[in-house]
Curated annotation (Swiss-Prot):
The lineage of its organism: Bacteria, Bacillati, Cyanobacteriota, Cyanophyceae, Synechococcales. It is an enzyme of class 3 (hydrolase). Keywords: Calvin cycle, Carbohydrate metabolism, Hydrolase, Manganese, Metal-binding. InterPro entries: FBPase_class-2/SBPase. Homotetramer. This is D-fructose 1,6-bisphosphatase class 2/sedoheptulose 1,7-bisphosphatase. It comes from Synechococcus sp. (strain CC9902). One of its GO terms (biological process) is gluconeogenesis. The keyword Thylakoid does not apply. Catalyzes the hydrolysis of fructose 1,6-bisphosphate (Fru 1,6-P2) and sedoheptulose 1,7-bisphosphate (Sed 1,7-P2) to fructose 6-phosphate and sedoheptulose 7-phosphate, respectively. Belongs to the FBPase class 2 family. It catalyses: beta-D-fructose 1,6-bisphosphate + H2O = beta-D-fructose 6-phosphate + phosphate; D-sedoheptulose 1,7-bisphosphate + H2O = D-sedoheptulose 7-phosphate + phosphate. It comes from the Bacteria. Mn(2+) 2 binds at residues 85, 88, 213.
């Protein structure tokens, strides 16, 4: 991948964010997601690359576009694998709540873990704690390590956890250490990445979320130098979700075996989930969030706020783009 391709990757998430944002606050989460998918795919297919969706909207028979295995791009140029979530936090977008964004991870061919549509236990932490905290340790132990690595008392730490019934015991354990809980309803990618930046007020992400988004988070944290680990969750009793009401632990283990995953309890490091030589993360806000603003529609332009993290040149770029309308008369600087 070269710098010109990274610019086009930025434009992919910008277009998806703009499309979704047209329905922000209108209670239409499926429609907002569909618009983002269409816009993302359209921009991808204009790029000179041999792109492939390795994590997308589902299996081929479940999703009409951006399905797993779909080829995107013109068919010329470099081979690029994509993990995409065109509208992460569809509920957040639908009800104009904070934290919805269009996101993707890109790498050279074979550089991203083909995560099954399962759940994943996740641990994200700042670079200072990389390799010191561990997902196999208790929350209490990890908070003690974080406190030492960051030079903060436990009661000065903020831990992000998704607001789910399955996290009741985890939340109680975290609070017992004195640390603060920041619950989120959806969209843990932005929370994971925020752990990699000082000054966000987010020090750690713990708990269980979707596995595909875990790969996207891992790509960002690998490029950023932060800590990320993931472990697949296959037991419905642990996932505690209505989506798995008809599934069994044994059936899920069989599904993983059929996918070639021989060690279902393996702990994956960021460098294993995003193992490519070149790894790029790109995200663009749909609604305002922790790292960047959402889409702003103005009389003469549309503004997007985005983040691109690349290990190719070890850069993080926060970008505000002004998309000018035809016949624009006056563009405000901010």
């Amino acid at each position: 991948m070269d710098q010109s391709l990274i610019q086009e990757i930025l434009e992919i998430v910008e277009q998806a964010a703009i499309a979704s944002a047209t329905l922000s606050g209108k209670g239409l989460k499926d429609e907002a997601d569909a618009l983002a998918v269409d816009a993302m795919r359209k921009r991808m297919n204009q790029i000179n690359m041999q792109g492939k969706i390795v994590i997308g909207e589902g299996e081929r028979d479940e999703a009409p576009m951006l399905y797993i295995g779909e080829e995107v791009g013109t068919g010329n140029g470099p081979g690029v694998d994509f993990a995409v979530d065109p509208c992460e936090g569809t509920n957040l977008c639908a009800y104009s709540q904070r934290g919805s964004m269009a996101v993707l991870a890109a790498s050279d061919r074979g550089g991203l873990f083909n995560a099954p549509d399962f759940y994943m236990k996740k641990l994200a932490a700042p670079p200072a704690a990389k390799g010191k905290v561990d997902i196999r340790k208790s929350a209490t132990e990890n908070i003690k390590i974080l406190s030492e690595c960051l030079g903060l008392a436990p009661d000065e730490l903020t831990i992000v956890v998704m607001d789910r019934a399955r996290h009741k015991d985890l939340i109680a354990e975290i609070r017992a250490t004195g640390a603060r809980i920041q619950p989120i309803s959806d969209g843990d990618v932005q929370a994971a990445i925020a752990c990699g930046f000082a000054g966000t007020g987010t020090h750690c992400l713990m708990g269980i979320g979707a596995a595909p988004e875990g790969v996207i988070s891992a790509a960002a944290m690998r490029a950023l130098g932060g800590h990320f680990q993931g472990q697949l969750v296959y037991d419905p009793a642990i996932a505690q979700t209505s989506e798995w009401a008809d599934m069994t632990k044994e059936g899920n283990l069989q599904r993983l075996a059929e996918m070639g995953i021989t060690d279902p309890d393996k702990v994956y490091e960021a460098s294993e989930l995003a193992c490519g030589e070149h790894v790029v993360f790109a995200g663009s806000g749909i609604t305002d969030g922790l790292l960047f603003n959402g889409v702003k529609f103005e009389a003469d332009c549309t503004r997007t706020s985005s983040l691109v993290i690349s290990n190719m040149n070890n850069t993080c770029s926060f970008t505000t783009t002004i998309h000018m309308k035809d016949g624009a008369q006056s563009i405000a600087l901010n």
